[in-house]
Curated annotation (Swiss-Prot):
It is found in: Cytoplasm. GO terms for biological process: fatty acid biosynthetic process; malonyl-CoA biosynthetic process. PANTHER family: ACETYL-COENZYME A CARBOXYLASE CARBOXYL TRANSFERASE SUBUNIT ALPHA (PTHR42853), ACETYL-COENZYME A CARBOXYLASE CARBOXYL TRANSFERASE SUBUNIT ALPHA, CHLOROPLASTIC (PTHR42853:SF3). Pfam families: ACCA (PF03255). Belongs to the AccA family. GO terms for molecular function: acetyl-CoA carboxylase activity; ATP binding; carboxyl- or carbamoyltransferase activity. This is Acetyl-coenzyme A carboxylase carboxyl transferase subunit alpha. InterPro entries: Acetyl_CoA_COase_a_su, ClpP/crotonase-like_dom_sf, COA_CT_C. Disulfide bonds: none annotated. Signal peptide: none annotated. Keywords: ATP-binding, Cytoplasm, Fatty acid biosynthesis, Fatty acid metabolism, Lipid biosynthesis, Lipid metabolism, Nucleotide-binding, Transferase. Its EC number is 2.1.3.15. It comes from the Bacteria.
Length: 318
């Protein structure tokens, strides 16, 4: 797969292009010229440069990484972390929203309910998934699956990655705000463990609608905010060009939200971001979720609900 590089990654892209060119030359000239040492030197230089660049990323750069077109989506994690996934469709009221995927699965043999936003890779898939922006029926499908999980005493695992809930007229007419509000209400009192993870964009109420849980985790280069940096800049400065300034001011990164005690854990990403090594990222996330599950499974239902309530009530009181 050809790697897409963001603007701030261009020095890395140039080094990798040099490495590929040397490898190509080496293959064609055979043993007459040994370029092994030069290639190794450039590969080491590339790793050092990548570590340096990624050691001091700003909020706007992290926001770009969270939206990277090759970043793993919910279905990528389902394929790597779970077995026996059985997708379920529809809200039993209006339609099946493809922006939300969900179903039963096994995590190391334990039955769980998996629910997440799903974006698309190519144009056709993006349209089918509505660019990862759920309509009310998507959130009602998620609610149906969560209530099913509660009946069968299965932990619920959600994967958050959306620019926000779809703001179209039809969605509003069918009760977008009510669907989100109902999810918040029900999730706060579910009698099974709920673990939520922001894997990319955590956009406003559209993210929060599947984001109330006993544990809320974020991947290292994901974001969580009430509005996009571009949206904030358009309101405050009447120009999306100030998005980088807005991103810094909004406190949208995992590190900042951890400081504010709005999330529980930050899941480290492979060097260069989750898209550089999806298998490694899936394994890191799986270990985080298994650790959380082991802790939550040991709690009595009353204790689980009490701790969840305390956590929700503590927000805003750092």
């Amino acid at each position: 797969m050809n790697m897409n590089f963001l603007e701030f990654e261009q020095p890395i892209a140039e080094l990798l292009a040099q490495i590929e060119e040397l490898k190509h030359v080496s293959e064609h000239v055979g043993s007459s010229v040994d370029l092994t040492d030069e290639i190794k030197h450039l590969e080491k230089k590339n790793e050092e440069l990548t570590r340096k660049l990624f050691s001091d990323l700003g909020a706007w750069q992290i926001s770009q990484l969270a939206r990277h077109p090759q970043r793993p989506y919910t279905e990528d994690y389902i394929a790597r972390m779970f077995t026996d996934f059985d997708e379920m469709a529809g809200d039993r009221a209006f339609a099946d929203d493809k922006a939300i995927v969900g179903g039963t699965a096994r995590l190391d043999g334990q039955p769980v309910m998996v629910i997440g936003h799903q974006k698309g890779r190519d144009t056709q898939e993006k349209i089918r998934r509505n660019f990862g922006m759920p309509r009310p029926e998507g959130y009602r499908k998620a609610l149906r699956l969560m209530q099913m999980a509660e009946r069968f005493k299965m932990p619920i695992l959600t994967f958050i990655d959306t620019p926000g809930a779809y703001p179209g007229v039809g969605a509003e007419e069918r009760g977008q705000s009510e669907a989100i509000a109902r999810n918040l209400k029900v999730m706060s009192s579910l009698k099974v463990p709920v673990i939520c993870t922001v894997i990319g964009e955590g956009g406003s109420g559209g993210a929060l609608a599947i984001g109330v849980g006993d544990r809320v985790n974020m991947l290292q280069y994901s974001t969580y905010s009430v509005i996009s940096p571009e949206g904030c800049a358009s309101i405050l400065w009447k120009s999306a060009d100030k998005a980088n300034v807005a991103a810094e001011a909004m406190g949208i990164t995992a590190a900042r939200l951890k400081e504010l005690k709005l999330i529980d854990s930050i899941v480290p990403e492979p060097l260069g971001g989750a898209h550089r090594n999806v298998d490694e990222m899936a394994n890191l996330l799986k270990q985080r979720i298994l650790t959380d599950l082991n802790e939550l499974n040991s709690l009595h239902t009353d204790e689980l609900l009490r701790k969840r309530y305390q956590q929700l009530m503590s927000h805003g009181y750092c």
